[in-house]
């Protein structure tokens, strides 16, 4: 079981709603995925009616909807979008996305942290999409985010876990769930993330653009289940498996440590 804020999930596969060829195919694929948390871009929703081609099928699934702020380029725009989503969809959950760079869609760390602080204070359950930066993820955790969502590789690239080393550090030090988001292009990537110790993955493009989105969604479902079972069963030597010896070096070692130098300076000051 995975708990985020006040909600428990039995599925560790979260999914998106973009790029499907039809709402009907989207609904069928999401059913096959077994996902219980589905994200949707507010810019694609008809806020006037609150009931459109995206919302109608999603509500049939009985899942938790996670509106995202995709398209926002600043903290102010993201906060505005989150407030709109809360009113239109009656949810205080939000996936925080701020990416001003339209070419690579990389998240803006400064604006993301600023928006997260405001939204958490307003009572939102904030799940921020961010770079695989261990320092930033810790800061997002400290301001009250319910989970962190570091990228595996750029959105829609299907390149897999190109940030693996940094994801390891994030997972090791995080006290909130870690959801690997973006770049997961094959079921094997999702399995790898779960074996690594991630709490969940979010997949959209790889399912939506597959020759058979329904079969691919089911494949991802099985991969995530397998990855979680493998981790719980106890992989070989790994820093995430306390029953086995830790043979991996994950800590940095300074080539020019300042310890002795600073001690000498302190001694000189006291002379």
Swiss-Prot record:
It comes from the Bacteria. InterPro entries: Aldolase_TIM (IPR013785), Thiazole_synthase_ThiG (IPR033983), ThiG (IPR008867). It is found in: Cytoplasm. One of its GO terms (cellular component) is cytoplasm. Pathway: Cofactor biosynthesis; thiamine diphosphate biosynthesis. 1-deoxy-D-xylulose 5-phosphate binds at residues 156, 182-183, 204-205. Its EC number is 2.8.1.10. HAMAP family: ThiG (MF_00443). One of its GO terms (molecular function) is thiazole synthase activity. Disulfide bonds: none annotated. Its main location: cytoplasm. Keywords: Cytoplasm, Schiff base, Thiamine biosynthesis, Transferase. It comes from Yersinia pseudotuberculosis serotype O:3 (strain YPIII). One of its GO terms (biological process) is thiamine diphosphate biosynthetic process. It is an enzyme of class 2 (transferase). This is Thiazole synthase. Pfam families: ThiG (PF05690). It catalyses: [ThiS sulfur-carrier protein]-C-terminal-Gly-aminoethanethioate + 2-iminoacetate + 1-deoxy-D-xylulose 5-phosphate = [ThiS sulfur-carrier protein]-C-terminal Gly-Gly + 2-[(2R,5Z)-2-carboxy-4-methylthiazol-5(2H)-ylidene]ethyl phosphate + 2 H2O + H(+). Homotetramer. Forms heterodimers with either ThiH or ThiS. PANTHER family: THIAZOLE SYNTHASE. The active site is at residue 95. Belongs to the ThiG family. Catalyzes the rearrangement of 1-deoxy-D-xylulose 5-phosphate (DXP) to produce the thiazole phosphate moiety of thiamine. Sulfur is provided by the thiocarboxylate moiety of the carrier protein ThiS. In vitro, sulfur can be provided by H(2)S. The keyword Hydrolase does not apply.
């Amino acid at each position: 079981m995975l708990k985020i804020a006040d909600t428990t999930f039995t599925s560790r596969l979260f999914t998106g709603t973009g790029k499907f060829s039809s709402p009907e195919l989207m609904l069928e694929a999401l059913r096959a995925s077994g996902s219980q948390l589905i994200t949707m871009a507010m810019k694609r929703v008809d806020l006037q009616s609150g009931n459109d081609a995206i919302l109608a099928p999603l509500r049939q699934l009985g899942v938790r909807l996670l509106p995202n702020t995709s398209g926002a380029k600043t903290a102010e725009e993201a906060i505005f979008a989150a407030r709109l989503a809360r009113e239109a969809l009656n949810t205080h959950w939000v996936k925080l996305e701020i990416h001003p760079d339209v070419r690579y869609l990389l998240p803006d760390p400064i604006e993301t942290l600023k928006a997260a602080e405001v939204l958490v204070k307003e009572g939102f359950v904030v799940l921020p999409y961010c770079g695989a930066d261990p320092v930033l993820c810790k800061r997002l955790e400290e301001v009250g985010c319910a989970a962190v969502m570091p990228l595996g590789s750029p959105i829609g690239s299907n390149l897999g876990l190109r940030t693996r080393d940094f994801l390891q550090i994030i997972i090791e030090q995080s006290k909130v769930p870690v959801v690997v988001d973006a770049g997961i292009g094959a079921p094997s990537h999702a399995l790898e993330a779960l074996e690594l110790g991630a709490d969940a993955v979010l997949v959209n493009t790889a399912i939506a653009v597959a020759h058979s989105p329904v079969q691919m969604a089911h494949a991802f479902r099985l991969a995530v289940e397998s990855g979680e079972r493998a981790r719980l069963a106890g992989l070989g030597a790994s820093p995430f498996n306390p029953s086995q010896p830790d043979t991996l070096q994950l800590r940095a070692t300074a080539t020019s440590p300042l310890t002795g130098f600073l001690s000498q300076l302190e001694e000189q000051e006291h002379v």
